[in-house]
């Protein structure tokens, strides 16, 4: 029997028994849909393959998608809203990085120094997750979702924002009201 410790959306610690390792992600999804989290976000954010970004199951980390009043799709996690940012590939003498999608937010003065990342100027930010390179992991996808076609570009933030508002009123029965 495995045990996983969650922090509820109200800050209570709860230990849940898991029958076997192959049931672990199902349990994380179940409680993650309630906004419960297990563990801390690693410095630099969670790392996932880029191919998982379009249908990533945010409940695995206790997060969910949310559309703000301006129609921008964001990710809510532990009371913070994270923006989607597309990062271009870097190919220089010093560094070579493939294109990526990052979910981050502006740092707050209450954020610990070790999670803050420097940007241009004096601006600092905190990363929740970054999707870059790697091979797709089906276990990270929303169960039953249609896998995005290989080579199909992800919708840009502008395209999503234009079409996001009409669909924002649809609410699933399972969704929590936070």
Swiss-Prot record:
Q: Which InterPro entries match?
A: ssDNA-bd_DdrB-like (IPR024305)
> What triggers expression?
Induced to high levels following extreme ionizing radiation exposure. Also highly induced in response to desiccation stress.
Q: Which GO terms describe its molecular function?
A: single-stranded DNA binding
A Gene Ontology BP annotation from the UniProt entry: DNA repair
Annotated Pfam families: DdrB
> Keyword S-adenosyl-L-methionine on this protein?
no
**What does UniProt give as the signal peptide span?**
none
Q: Where is this region: Disordered?
A: 139-178
The question of whether DNA damage is a record keyword is answered with yes
Which residues fall in a compositionally biased region of kind Low complexity? 147-165
Keyword terms: DNA damage, DNA repair, DNA-binding, Stress response
Domains: entry comment: Contains a novel ssDNA-binding fold, which is structurally and topologically distinct from the OB-fold universally found in standard SSB proteins. The disordered C-terminus of DdrB may mediate interactions with other proteins important for DNA damage recovery.
Biological role: ssDNA-binding protein that probably contributes to the ionizing radiation resistance of D.geothermalis. Plays a role in DNA repair and genome reconstitution, in a RecA-independent process, and is necessary for recovery from severe genomic fragmentation as a result of exposure to severe levels of ionizing radiation. Binds single-stranded DNA but not duplex DNA.
| Subunit (UniProt) | Homopentamer; arranged in a ring-structure.
Protein name per the record: Single-stranded DNA-binding protein DdrB
């Amino acid at each position: 029997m495995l045990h996983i410790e969650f922090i509820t959306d109200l800050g209570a610690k709860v230990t849940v028994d898991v029958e076997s390792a192959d049931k672990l992600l199902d349990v994380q999804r179940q409680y993650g849909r309630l906004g419960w989290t297990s563990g801390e976000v690693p410095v630099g954010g969670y790392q996932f393959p880029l191919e998982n970004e379009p249908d990533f199951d945010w409940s695995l980390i206790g997060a969910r998608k949310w559309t703000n009043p301006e129609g921008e799709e964001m990710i809510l996690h532990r009371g913070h809203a994270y923006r989607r940012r597309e990062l271009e590939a870097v190919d220089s003498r010093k560094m070579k990085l493939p294109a990526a999608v990052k979910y981050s937010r502006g740092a707050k003065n209450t954020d610990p120094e070790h999670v803050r990342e420097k940007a241009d100027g004096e601006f600092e930010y905190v990363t929740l997750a970054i999707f870059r390179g790697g091979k797709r992991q089906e276990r990270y996808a929303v169960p039953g979702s249609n896998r995005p076609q290989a080579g199909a570009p992800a919708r840009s933030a502008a395209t999503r924002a234009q079409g996001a508002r009409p669909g924002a009123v649809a609410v699933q029965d399972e969704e929590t009201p936070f």
